[in-house]
Amino acid sequence: MSARPDTPLLDTVSYPEDLRKLEPGQLRQLSDELRAEMISAVGVTGGHLGSGLGVVELTAAIHYVFNTPEDRLIWDVGHQCYPHKILTGRRDRIRTLRQGGGLSGFTKRSESEYDPFGAAHSSTSISAGLGFAVANKLKGEPGKAIAVIGDGAMSAGMAYEAMNNAEQAGNRLIVILNDNDMSIAPPVGGLSGYLARLMSSSEYLGLRSLASRMTAKVSRRVHTSLGKAEEYTKGLVTGGTLFEELGFYYVGPIDGHNLDHLIPVLENVRDAEEGPFLIHVRTVKGKGYAPAENSADKYHGVAKFDVVTGEQKKSTGGPPAYQNVFGETLAKLADSDPRICAITAAMPSGTGVDKFAKAHPDRAFDVGIAEQHGVTFAAGLAAQGMRPFAAIYSTFLQRAYDQVVHDVAIQNLPVRFAIDRAGLVGADGSTHAGSFDVTYLATLPNFVVMAAADEAELVHMTYTAAEHDSGPIAFRYPRGGGIGIDLPETPEKLEIGKGRIVKHGSKVALLSLGTRLEEAKRAADELEAKGLSTTIADMRFAKPLDTELIAQLMKNHEVVVTIEEASIGGLGAHVLTYASDEGLTDAGLKIRTMRLPDAFIEQDAPEKQYDEAGLTAPHIVDTVLKALRQNSAGVEEARA
């Protein structure tokens, strides 16, 4: 492990109030030390490195100029918040990032007063900032709201919806566009930095206000024309016309690593009577750490790594990741089916669509952080005879639920949903858990909902979805590697709504949906050792249910337990509803449902999360024994 960096100036700063005691000329040294500390910490924990390295100077400048936490600083997504955490009283815990019981990898209201709004999903910061700004305005309280949003997050419509309503906040709202992808602005140089300071100065803003009042006395047509002339002239130099149209005073672009530019611009905007402002800041993702700057992904998300070399600690060889199994299977299917296409919302490698895109680039579509558009785009493709696969994380599909209902389900369009990161996901915690998709999809008419028990089942389900043209179909699978089962050379088309018996028994029936099947197998072994003959069924489908199989198991077993890595309202609820409707519980059958608890489970290793959720083999055994009123030794307990 590398030694911790020498940080004499940073050691004197625990909170922003300490930072504000420094001289402006000391901020360069502070930023260098802050960057070194962040690299050292993430080398130990893993996490999102590149984004935070790119905003070190910006973070220091914001806390130096603004009176946080009274001025509310809101980070969009939160990938870039590690330097912010170090400067706001959490440096002593920074090496617990994303660990069980440690600091969150995102901003979190319960963690610090300097985190006024939690984040992890994209493009929410401007709306939240507007809420803070307007609330302070209505209450007559001081305080600005500063929303820092990346250029990638600006691809989502929600950001523009917020900006379109932001004028009511006046000078209380400041949006900082952190542009690190060279996708919006021309190159930054001395002229643009000079213009930014000029256009944010009180003299310029005062002159602009005076000119506006004077031109208001001429005809409306002339007044409008003069305003447009100024706007477009400035836009030619800065690229800010769009933001001006939305009612913002646009400043920039400026070099986000040049403190001599950042500090005066932020001070000018802080003191301005006009507003709202959008400050366009250009940064370099991975700034100051050569391995990150030279990497294609700028070390966006990394495992633990050697700080000196940048070499990440590779996991030992094992089964292929589920997303890669999906991507490679879909690419093979598309070789012989020109109707198959794939859609991802800014997560090509995370969903495996990158594998598909290499083979079929003309049929792979990355729509950016725009899940709503992506789903309706897929619906349009399906309506025109294509076979679209919308590959979206479970937690992000929530963002497009209206489109799933209105544009897909109601029209019964055959959109295929490949739902990655189903269940609990480990270090990213509750904001990224795929807890709810079974519940929110299986309740919809026309939908077919599947869950893969292993990587071989995922191959079959991908093929089944490709061949299913009679309506929408979804299949879910978890993060990480499979169980090591051999992949089938030829995929099998599954019969819709039919499960499979994995093990035959006579007293206890375990109905598993998804990858908890392995825990069900371990539980069955333990139950058999206690003399309890156990059947295991891999249900495969949450909807439609295999009612024939369920009825058979309920009539021939004393205890039936459903097991799923999903929230209440999923398989268990549907099985109970069916059993009630058919009177299958009238004769005293014992039914128990095991699912994720009614709580948000925080970051930890997945196996610890599932233990906390009560979804491991010992929990299954305990549930069966309690249903039979037996103790852990399998001996029947006395009844009260």
From Swiss-Prot:
Binding locations of Mg(2+): D151, N180
Classification via CDD domains: TPP_DXS, TPP_PYR_DXS_TK_like
BP term (GO), one: glyceraldehyde-3-phosphate metabolic process
Residues the record lists as binding thiamine diphosphate: H79, A120, H121, S122, G152, A153, N180, Y289, E371
InterPro entries: Dxylulose-5-P_synthase, THDP-binding, Transketo_C/PFOR_II, Transketolase-like_Pyr-bd, Transketolase_C, Transketolase_CS
Enzyme kind, highest EC tier: transferase
Cofactor: Mg(2+); thiamine diphosphate
GO molecular function, one term: magnesium ion binding
Subunit structure of this chain's protein: Homodimer.
UniProt keyword annotation of Metal-binding present: yes
Pathway recorded for this protein: Metabolic intermediate biosynthesis; 1-deoxy-D-xylulose 5-phosphate biosynthesis; 1-deoxy-D-xylulose 5-phosphate from D-glyceraldehyde 3-phosphate and pyruvate: step 1/1
Function: Catalyzes the acyloin condensation reaction between C atoms 2 and 3 of pyruvate and glyceraldehyde 3-phosphate to yield 1-deoxy-D-xylulose-5-phosphate (DXP).
Keyword Magnesium in annotation: yes
Family the UniProt entry places it in: Belongs to the transketolase family. DXPS subfamily.
Cofactor remark from the record: Binds 1 Mg(2+) ion per subunit.
Pfam families the record matches: DXP_synthase_N (PF13292), Transket_pyr (PF02779), Transketolase_C (PF02780)
Reaction catalyzed: D-glyceraldehyde 3-phosphate + pyruvate + H(+) = 1-deoxy-D-xylulose 5-phosphate + CO2
The protein's name: 1-deoxy-D-xylulose-5-phosphate synthase
Enzyme Commission no: 2.2.1.7
